[in-house]
Structure formats: C-alpha cells, structure tokens
C-alpha cells in the first residue's frame, strides 16, 4: 500500500481584499486599505498548487466561501434586498461589512485539524473544522468549511467528519496552523504535535500580553479526543508568548514539520528541551531531525517578515525533502543566507523552491497558510472527490474560470457594490459544478 501526504490548497475567492481585519497579524494590518487583485491572487495560488502536482505530489483544491456573506448580515439585523443590505451595512457598520466580505478561507491551514487513519483508534481519517472564534471574519467560516470538506472527502468508509468545537474562547481553535505531525513514513503511526497559546482554564499560566493567543490547550485536547488519538502519539506544546506578541499569531509562522523533520525557530516554544525529549521518546528509535534556527542567524522580525517558517516542507518522490518558500525569503538577506546554508547541512532538506504568492503574503499568509495537509493511503486518495484533485485539465479549467469571473482590482469601498454579490455567486455556482461539490453554499439552498 502506498502512502502520500496530500496538500489541499484554498482557492482564493472573488472578494480577496486588504481590509486589515487580523489584529496580531502584522502583514494584514500593515497593508490595510491597499488595492488587491483577486485575479492575480487566485492565479498565484493555482500556479503554486500546480507546481507541487508537477513535482509528483498529491495536490487538491478546496473551494472558497460565499462572500459577501449576506446570510450573516441578515442574522445581525440588516434587511431588505441584497443591494439594500450592502448599502445599509456600508453606512451603518462598515467594519461588519468588511468582516462579511473577507476571502480568508483561502488559508486552509486554518480550515481544520486532520488526523490520518494510521494515528486513529478507528482507522479512519478524521477532520474537525476550526471554529476560529478569535476573529469575527473567520468565525463565520466553520459551517461552510464543514460542507466543503464533506463534499471533498465524501466516502464515510474512510473519512470521519466532526462538528467544529463549541464557539467560545475557552475552545479557541485555529486548526492545522497550530498542529503538525511527525512520522517515519506517512503510513506509519506518528506523533501529532498540538501547539497552543494559552490555557483557558488556568489564568495563572503564561500567555501573551499584547496580541491574543488564538489557540487554547483545551481546544487542542478536545480535538485529540474527537480524533481518537493515543496519548503515546500526542504532544502538547505551548508556543512562546513573547513571539506571539511579536506577530507570530499561529505556530506555522515559527515552526513546520514533515515526516522526521521539525524545523523551528530557537524562540518558538516554551520548555523546548523537555518537549523535544518527549517528542523523541514518543517517536521511537527511527531517525529524527530537529532543525533549530538560532536567533543569531534569523531574528524573529525577519522570520515574520519573510515567512521563513510559513513554508511547506515536502517529501519529493525521490525521497529528498524540499522547502516551498515565498519569494519574500529570497528578498531578506539573513533568511536567504540561512536557506542557502540549510540545504548543505546534514538534514533531509536538500532544496528550496521559491514561489510568488505576494497577494496572499500581503494579507499575512504564506505557502503553508494556503494548504491543508492530509496524509492518506492509496485507497483513501481514490476515495477523494476526484474533481478536486489538481491536474492539467483542472488547472486549465480553473484559470479559465478565474479569467471569466474575477476582477483585476478591488478596493475596500468596492465591497458594497451589489454587482460583486452577483459576480461571486455566479462564479461559485459554476465552481460547484466544475468540482462536483453539490450545494455547499447558503445561496444554493
């Protein structure tokens, strides 16, 4: 039986804009009110996804959410026609309108936490959508995320879908952006690392002072229970509160793992040595590589600005590992120098491939934000909705779809344009036919 780690990238939605919605995310705040290009953003994402498929990796796409989200605007008291609702919201509550127009679902690292069948007691692949309660614009995503995941992984013989956790800050859950999995082989039982920012039920425990800790220990423990994980294959690690306060809002901004490699910054975690020992003990006797980047070589500020750790570490068909990095890493002298040195060291990482995802980067999301990792065996891959898997035909079809429906430029003030609702719904309705998703959106029901 062959085993793979698939990447399911978020297709950037038609309302991709820079509204500066994400407190704690430095890039998002710094680029607030800039002009975006939904068309460029979608094409950059597709190009990156296709390149990984061409490298021989299993690559899928996850559909975007319906935006503007008129259903939520109606829930909070706006009424009338679609045009009237947008007009009223723009005048009376512009911040709420912006929140209901975000294309943030493109960052599918926050879509869900995924545990492969090799790790779970029932031998199924488990999905729990993240509730994303810390940010209003993301907290309205989980129900549709669940619909899209179920339409993509739609065979109950192999896939188990859970409801997102209770919508309360005690269970603040940001999905796979705070989760990674180490294993000797993708098909072997691994060690799942859950990284949290604070303990909700322990006020005296360490936590950041400036920016919010979006993930709680309680949420991570709940997901592990839902996924039927063994305690011997689970490690809970607290992220260093000081780096959260420097803009490291998710763990995938300061660390990333793949198979037997954990690539992380020296300041990423609390109690680092004790936790590395726990990982090693639970991992077993197989080779395990801890690749620690010292502050003396890459400062936290450079790591955040370049998104050195918001890279994908992937295993190529040759068995070597490669880092999929944003071009911003080439533009930062300290980071570029480090990556050039890294590929010469005694680790499985032997090459770095650079991609332009600047439209996403300017909103605070690098290559790793754009993908949800799903480790699968060949039977599970065959059970996935095949219309969501990247190949030459889907790449061509989705690029044509973007050309047909997406705007070249979008300003925040354009979000109140009633035509944008029509354009977005028309595009998504066609997309559900291309990807054979069924009626996953509110407007289709």
Curated annotation (Swiss-Prot):
Molecular-function GO term, any one: N-succinylarginine dihydrolase activity
Keywords for the protein's UniProt record, in alphabetical order: Arginine metabolism, Hydrolase
PANTHER family: N-SUCCINYLARGININE DIHYDROLASE
Organism: Shewanella pealeana (strain ATCC 700345 / ANG-SQ1)
Catalytic activity: N(2)-succinyl-L-arginine + 2 H2O + 2 H(+) = N(2)-succinyl-L-ornithine + 2 NH4(+) + CO2
InterPro entries for this protein: AstB_sf (IPR037031), SuccinylArg_d-Hdrlase_AstB (IPR007079)
Domain of life: Bacteria
Active site: 174, 250, 369
Name of the molecule in the record: N-succinylarginine dihydrolase
Family listed: Belongs to the succinylarginine dihydrolase family.
Annotated positions binding substrate: 19-28, 110, 137-138, 214, 252, 363
GO BP, one annotated term: arginine catabolic process to succinate
Pathway: Amino-acid degradation; L-arginine degradation via AST pathway; L-glutamate and succinate from L-arginine: step 2/5
